[in-house]
Amino acid sequence: MIQDSEFFRMEGVPITKEEIRAVSIGKLNLNPEDIVLDIGCGSGGMSVEISKRSKFVYAIDNSEDAKNTTVTNLKKFKIENCEVFLGDAKDLISEFDFNKVFIGGTQNIEQILEILKEKKIEKVVANTIVLENSVKIISKFEELRYNVDFVNVSVSYGKKINSGHIMLSKNPITIITATLK
């Protein structure tokens, strides 16, 4: 995994943290022939990491700052098998052929999941911070008859202080994995 500090960052544009990227990549179970859709690409951390492990990535975000930040990071890491799009994912999904999806954040999640089901997408991994969004996504996947697995990941970083070391926690992330039955 690329360290977070190596990515170009823009204020207000989120990035999936290194340890969360590692677990999410593992849950996607990528292979070199996969074509992946990254919805809510943010700073492009997942787009970069997925591109290194798959055939091609389509990245979408509705923020121009996020799109530009992702493009900058793709160039920085010399990634050529990823194309970035600005817009609403629910309006763009039908334009692409892909077999796996990573969702880092989006609006209209229930509509998007319905479209993914219609396209018979075999694996979707969605990361959430907000509990209500986790419940909404899990419930919708179950309604759509996906096999659903989820894990809540908490990461703490060590910091040296005068009297020793302490662990500083980051926000826990729920990683939801849905597999087509």
UniProtKB/Swiss-Prot annotation:
Disulfide bridge partners, by residue number: none
GO molecular function: cobalt-precorrin-6B C5-methyltransferase activity; protein methyltransferase activity
Catalytic reaction annotation: Co-precorrin-6B + S-adenosyl-L-methionine = Co-precorrin-7 + S-adenosyl-L-homocysteine + CO2
Catalytic class of the enzyme: transferase
Binding site for S-adenosyl-L-methionine: T16, G40, C41, G42, S43, G44, D61, A89
Pfam families linked: Methyltransf_25
Annotated EC: 2.1.1.196
A single BP term in Gene Ontology: methylation
Keywords from the UniProt entry: Cobalamin biosynthesis, Methyltransferase, S-adenosyl-L-methionine, Transferase
Alphabetical list of CDD domains matching this protein: AdoMet_MTases (cd02440)
Similarity comment: family membership: Belongs to the methyltransferase superfamily. Archaeal-type CbiT family.
PANTHER family: COBALT-PRECORRIN-6B C(15)-METHYLTRANSFERASE (DECARBOXYLATING), COBALT-PRECORRIN-7 C(5)-METHYLTRANSFERASE
Protein name in the entry: Probable cobalt-precorrin-6B C(15)-methyltransferase (decarboxylating)
Gene name for this UniProt entry: cbiT
